[in-house]
């Protein structure tokens, strides 16, 4: 028997997801890096059905002086979620978030404070420091973190609007390596938990959603696929299927078989073992 959840988070209900005043009917968050060209970017975003698109602030032209990835985004259809990818300390992440707010006019920010360029794992101390400061400055912080449940709790207590634990290292395609940690985090916080990073294929998305995650953020899983457009459709469908399965409730795992057909009124063939 499953233990009861602590509280009843609104995002567990069969309702649209709300983060920072934005309402999302799609629970798939999609990044804009690594696509072959602008046309492929547009197509994949449209096919995925995403309503929230992440943009690496340090890797796009925000000046308006030349071609920019932002030109490919439909601001009527997509909420732009600027992220601080490429920042390795709290100070640079804070500066990047402030720049994004000034240029894009949004208080939303996906906070990333990375530990090193090889693993791209989040730095916990810098992440806590930057979260505290950005919340104090009025940002709606969606924070990328490890799958450590206690760290996720601390970030939620600091005022993060959503906690985004890594399923596995960024771009690794390893999927959700520690589903038990994600489940524990879901038990401990009432803000949305969005699994972020490491998604390699549609089944990874389905698993994250079946665990009870409020959403999944991915980029490489679509952009680096052999057929990105087809994979965008697969990720979209997996997100929906996983959410529906979670809401429906899976049957418990059992050691022994349990016949699905009723035994009452069973007709036994005469002469067979076990029959009258």
Residue spans for each PLM region:
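Basic/polar N-terminal segments that are highly enriched at the extreme N-terminus
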Residues: 1-15
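Non-catalytic, usually N-terminal nucleic-acid engagement modules in DNA/RNA processing proteins
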Residues: 58
